[in-house]
Amino acid sequence: MASVAEQLASNISFSAFKNATELKKRIWFTLLALLVYRLGTYLPLPGINIDTLRQIFEQNQSGIIGIFNMFAGGAVGRMAILSLGIMPYITSSIIIQLVVPVVPKLNYLKKEGGEQGRRQINQYTRYGTVFLATIQAWGIAVGLEGASGVVIDPGLFFKVSAVITLVGGTIFLMWLGEQITSRGLGNGISLLIFAGIIAELPAALFGTLQLGRQGALSGALIIGLVFLVIIILTFVVFMERAQRRLIVQYPKRQVGNKMFGGDNSHLPLKLNTAGVIPPIFASSLLLMPITIANFSTGEGQGWLNTVTAMLGRGQTLYMLLYAGLIVFFCYFYTAIVFNPSDTADNLKKQGGFIPGIRPGEKTAEYIDFILSRLTVVGATYLVLVCLLPEFLISRYAVPFYFGGTSILIIVNVAMDTMTQFQGYLFAHQYEGLLKKS
C-alpha cells in the first residue's frame, strides 16, 4: 500500500512547474552556486608549481588521498584554493555531535534551547571548522614545502598565505552550503559533495576506457564493472526506500450521536535511518590524520608514510577501521535523529497505540527493539556497499575511486533533492489548500 507521501506525489502535475516562480528561482540559485564552487576548484593556490605537484599526485592518487580528492571535487590534485573542501566542517560536526550528549550545557541547548539553541550549536560547529581547517591547512603547507620543487618560494610567508587561503576557501564553502540550503534546493553541504563526485566521474570513466584500449583492462572486465555499478545502484535505491511500518490504531470517540476516529495509520521506520552520514563520517575520520602524508618527502615522515600505506585502498587495517566506524556511526546517528521515547510520548498524547503494546514506556521499548534490529541490517548493508567496491578496486586495480561511499552519496542526495523538488511543486499546486489548513 502506498504511503501518504507517495499518494501525494502521484497527484503532482509537473505542468505546474512553468508557473512555479519560487521553485525556478531556487533551482537557478542552486545551479549558480554549484558553478561558482566548480570554478573555485580550478583556482590554484598561490606560489605552487602546478606541473611538479601534478607529477607527485599522479604517483600517489591510488591511496586514501584519492578519496580526499573525490570529496574535494578534484581540487586536491590541482591544489586549488578549495582543496580542503567541506571536510573540516563535517569533522567538526562529528565532534560537536559526539560531545553534545555528555556536556550538560550543550545538551540543554539542544533539548530546551529551541531555535536559538540550535543556532548556538551551529555557531560552535563553525568555530570548530575554522580551528580544524587551520590545523589541516598548516599541515598541508608544511607538507608541500617538504615535497621537492612544489613550492616556488618556501618560507613563512608561503605558509601563512596558504593557511589564510585554504581556511578562507573552507569558510566560503561552509557559507555557500548554508546559502544553498536556505535559498536554493536541497541540502547545501550534501550538494557540494555530490557536485564534486559527479564532476570527477567523466574523467575517471575516460581513464578506465583508455586502459581498456591499451589492453591493461579486458573488455569483459569493463562490461562486468558496468553491470556491477548498475546492480549496486539498484540495490542502494531499494534499501534506501525500504522501511518497516508499525501499525498504529486510534480509538473511536463518540461526540453526540456521531463516532469519530478509529482510523488505522502506520509509523514508518527506515531500514537505514542514518542515511549516508556514517560512511561520510568514517571517511572523514580516516582522512584527518594523514591529509599531508602523500605530499611530504622530508625526513622524519617515515611513520606517516607507513600509516598511509596501511590505510591504502584494499588494506586490511583500512577496511576493518572503515567497517567498524560505519557500524558505530550507524547506531550513534540513529540514536540522535530518532528518539523512541519521544515518539511513544507523542503517540500517547494523540491517543494512538500499537496493537498488543501498552502505550508509554512499553511502546518506547518496542520501538527501540525494532529500531535496533533494523539498524543491524542497515549497518550491514552500508558496510557491504562501501567495502565491496573497495575490495574489487584493490583486486582488479581499477584506476579511479568509485567506491560505495560515492554511490551512496549520489543516490541519497539525488533522492532527497527530488523529494524537496516535489514538495515545492506540490506546495505551489495546492497553495490554496495549504493556506486553509
Give the predicted meaning of each segment:
Residues A2-S437:
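N-terminal cationic and glycine-rich segments that engage phosphates or anionic surfaces
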